[in-house]
């Protein structure tokens, strides 16, 4: 009986514990220098823990309506909506069955092109946003004005910072370019490529590019990226 009480008490104590450092970031940098480590060592370790402690967000079923299955990602701050055509799946033509919502319109993802051509960047918009939607970084309270005066968010990985910039600024704008330069030296966190492909349903679109997962998006690509949010 005593053992059970101690277990409950310890569980409540851990549940109330806040995630995050109790010292400001500059203090952690000073600590890093004192033990001959890189100044971003704490941010790197902490971000990795935040990203993979809960294995990120997942794709969840919402409803079935008029021949489509509707799904959405579980993250509240970056919610992506996707659907798949049940008629195409019945015809075993699952390659073009998935669509994602971009600025109120449905766009097809996972198209297989039969004629030769340069299709390398055709799906960049989806995989850019999909990477951020899956990441478990807490994207609440991100203020673009505070970011402009140098208040960097230590608890966001580089991909999520780039995503917030794309979401809150216009493509090819001077404002976006300036903010991307601020985030240029932020530490990039690798996300395993299987996270892009492994979802709760079979026959999901195949991620063909490691960009955003094992290789960071370039400044040029982020500058030109169209946001899916209205």
UniProtKB/Swiss-Prot annotation:
Q: Name one GO cellular component term.
A: host cell cytoplasm
What residue stretch is flagged as signal peptide? none
* Membership in a protein family: Belongs to the ovine/caprine lentivirus group Vif protein family.
* Pfam families per record: Lenti_VIF_2 (PF07401)
Provide the species name: Maedi visna virus (strain 1514 / clone LV1-1KS1)
In its UniProt entry, what is this protein called?
Virion infectivity factor
Q: Which UniProt keywords apply?
A: Host cytoplasm, Virion
Quote the subcellular location field of this record: Host cytoplasm; Virion
TM spans, by residue? none
The chain's coiled-coil residues are none
